[in-house]
């Protein structure tokens, strides 16, 4: 799709979406996004220029379909996939990608860690993906050098450059964790639960040096600028339990992420901010508001948040509750959580369950936000239900296969696709049918006449 668009810009010194937006140029990617989101192209351009909307679109991911993350656009959902040292392979990861996209993933992160063939896995995922692919480069850095304590600045830049050339559209970089935050971490119940953050912290504590990603942040920006890789500024100190939510460690890092955001914007690099995590319902709004203040309204991208800690096996449900609220308060993208969260590596079915839970959360928030067209399918579904149009109901459902499967468990015969009831109420107790029959046989003219006569009689008394 984007081959010709990118070819036209080959001789431009800078080719990031933010650069063009600041110059007043509406790119083809912005036009595409505007059409998909039912927005004015000029609004898209101005929001990208301001940093409140990002279009993650590496110039080397040429078959990518552009999408937008920001408050003027629909709430987006990210799916995490990736191989580990103990499970999964290229074919499995591509199937997870396809399942993610099938059920509505707007972006996908390849979080492969410890796998033997990470480059090949990523190449296969990008080649098969119509959506932006994100990574946490630290995982491959450690995989290549073997020991995080041996990490050098050159190791970081080498892997970032390699992944950027492959077509990765956004990097999660844990650059906001600083040495001065370490005393606050000791006060926590669960310390650092971010993988990238914990690895970075171990290097810092061993060498008594500042965060290497923070130290060479300008060099990282140069790579991002060359390939138009967006930055997803990682929250190393996101709370891993309700006890640690909204503590000083989390909020102090958030302020640093705001400073890094301004530095990235100065180099025309797009930014979004990663957020928690585990947050009680009553603290979600405050977390969103603080991000908007500290990070200058850069799009907020949150993991959940989980609103309880005892939902093991059902964390996709507990976190979808927090996700819907977070999106309503102002979060732009939700990172899904699967039923396997805290328990193991998700399989293809777990990806499906997590994606659908989060599409429900995102869609619910968009309806509440009155996003143009967000409720159209819901209204169509209401019409189809009242008309007993079962095939239309299946078609409109977020998961048509599951909707049909549940219906057919008790009424599998094709004749029941025309029935004016389901197995819940049967033919005699269906409220839709009872109401329709009552309305159809009701004499409205007679009712109106009786009502008018009653009103006259009451007036005379």
Swiss-Prot record:
GO CC list: cytosol
UniProt-annotated binding residues for [4Fe-4S] cluster: 422, 425, 430
InterPro entries named among the record's database cross-references: ThiC, ThiC/Bza_core_dom, ThiC/BzaA/B
UniProt keyword list: 4Fe-4S, Iron, Iron-sulfur, Lyase, Metal-binding, S-adenosyl-L-methionine, Thiamine biosynthesis, Zinc
Catalytic activity, reaction form: 5-amino-1-(5-phospho-beta-D-ribosyl)imidazole + S-adenosyl-L-methionine = 4-amino-2-methyl-5-(phosphooxymethyl)pyrimidine + CO + 5'-deoxyadenosine + formate + L-methionine + 3 H(+)
Residues involved in Zn(2+) binding: 278, 342
Annotated metabolic or biological route of this protein: Cofactor biosynthesis; thiamine diphosphate biosynthesis
Comment on bound cofactor: Binds 1 [4Fe-4S] cluster per subunit. The cluster is coordinated with 3 cysteines and an exchangeable S-adenosyl-L-methionine.
The protein's enzyme class: lyase
Subunit structure: Homodimer.
Similarity section: Belongs to the ThiC family.
Name used for this protein in its record: Phosphomethylpyrimidine synthase
